[in-house]
Design a protein with these regions (language model features):
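Eukaryote-biased detector of low-complexity, proline/serine/threonine-rich segments
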Residues: 338-344
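Secreted, periplasmic, or luminal enzymes acting at the cell surface/secretory milieu
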Residues: 1-52, 58-67, 71-76, 154-285, ...
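Hydrophobic helix-and-loop "lid/oligomerization" segment in the mid-to-C-terminal part
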Residues: 2-3, 81-148, 152-166
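Short acidic, glycine/proline-rich loop/turn micro-motifs
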Residues: 48-54, 120-125, 165, 302-304
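Short acidic, flexible loop segments centered on an aromatic residue
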Residues: 281-298, 304-306
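Intrinsically disordered, low-complexity Pro/Gly/Ser/Thr-rich segments with frequent PxxP/GP/PP motifs
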Residues: 298-334, 338
Length: 344
């Protein structure tokens, strides 16, 4: 089970699942020549919790922590000063001063925060979806150092991260990465892997927005309209902090005009294509997503529906054509009579 190939696959799978949520001023990837790093947080040197809700099937001794992963990546040329800072649920702030001092002495601060493994999973509902315990207060303290702050998140569900987003310069959603946690996180933070993953669920601004499906009905949640509280929340926008399908990269991509014929072919398919160009400075993968919207129908339809996606590798400066084939049934829906219909 723990063969070299299995460990390499676990490392790649973990890194490939990580979603870059924020990257102000292109802070990431970090330079491998960074001299001093402050590493803080209850998940920065933790083995058991990073395996997630199936940790009973794993062995703590097999886990590479984030602290170990960064040291593996950078070697002795970089000083990594680790302070836990706080626990998940303990209200103590006794290590805040040490964490702040470490941050002040660093070139960059990496905070690894999130949930305990068994806070997620079956029968693990939470009413409040913010970071548990004193973790947000820890981030507020680290911000006072005035150094670039990278937040690595480990959690098993969407969280309400508006306050974290305001404090962080960069945010990486790592989920629960498993045994190769530290190596995978380091691969992404230091640019050996360019993030490409997208969110499979929306991250709300607040719990009061839930349910917040991306494919909500047009009449179910109207758009934000000024001076009217009848079509929106009165205290927050209707939008999510990070929507379904969202995810950044270290490189940039531009999309050409979508090519789509006006009719299906005789086999019931509609070919759709778009040219995607890597306009940034890194080779990278892009997940091209195809959505459809039925603007006029006999029933109220979702604002959009995902009908296809493809991950394509595009070297910097190059363009690739991405093609989809829509089936006529992809545009249908179940009506009030429980009949599956495709309307003109």
């Amino acid at each position: 089970v723990r063969s070299a190939s299995a460990m390499a696959l676990a490392r790649k799978a973990a890194a490939s699942s990580m979603v870059l949520l924020k990257n102000a001023n292109a802070l990431l990837p970090l330079s491998k020549q960074t001299k001093r790093i402050a590493l803080v947080g209850p998940l920065a040197n933790n083995r058991a919790e990073v395996m997630g809700s199936w940790k009973a099937r794993g062995e703590d001794k097999d886990v590479v922590t984030v602290l170990e992963g960064i040291k593996n990546k950078l070697g002795s040329g970089t000083e990594v000063n680790y302070v836990q800072g706080c626990d998940f649920l303990d209200p103590s702030t006794s290590e805040f001063s040490a964490a702040l001092e470490a941050a002040k002495q660093s070139d960059v601060v990496i905070a690894v925060v999130g949930e305990k493994a068994l806070m997620s999973g079956e029968s693990r509902s939470r009413a409040v979806l913010r970071l548990p315990g004193k973790q947000e207060a820890l981030l507020d303290t680290l911000r006072k150092a005035g150094k670039p702050l990278v937040v690595v998140l480990m959690n098993g569900r969407p969280l309400c991260l508006e306050s974290v987003d305001k404090q962080a310069d960069a945010m990486l959603e790592a989920w629960f990465p498993g045994t190769q946690c530290g190596n995978a996180v380091a691969d992404v933070l230091f640019g050996d892997i360019v993030p490409a993953a997208k969110l499979t669920a929306s991250f709300p601004l607040t719990e009061g927005q839930i349910p917040n499906n991306y494919n909500y009905k047009r009449s179910g949640r109207p758009g934000d309209m000024p001076y009217s509280s009848t079509v929106r929340h009165i205290d927050v926008p209707n939008r999510n902090l990070y929507p379904f399908g969202y995810g950044l990269s270290y490189t940039t991509f531009s999309y050409g005009e979508m090519q789509c014929p006006t009719a299906f072919d005789d086999k019931g398919f509609l070919p759709v294509s778009v040219d995607v160009t890597n306009t940034g400075n890194y080779d990278g993968e892009e997940i091209v997503q195809l959505y459809v919207a039925d603007k006029v129908a006999s029933m109220v339809r979702p604002v959009k529906e995902l009908k296809g996606f493809q991950k394509v590798f595009i070297p910097k400066g190059q363009t690739k054509r991405v093609e989809f084939k829509l089936n006529v049934k992809d545009l249908g829906f179940w009506n009030n009579l429980m009949q599956y219909v495709v309307e003109p």
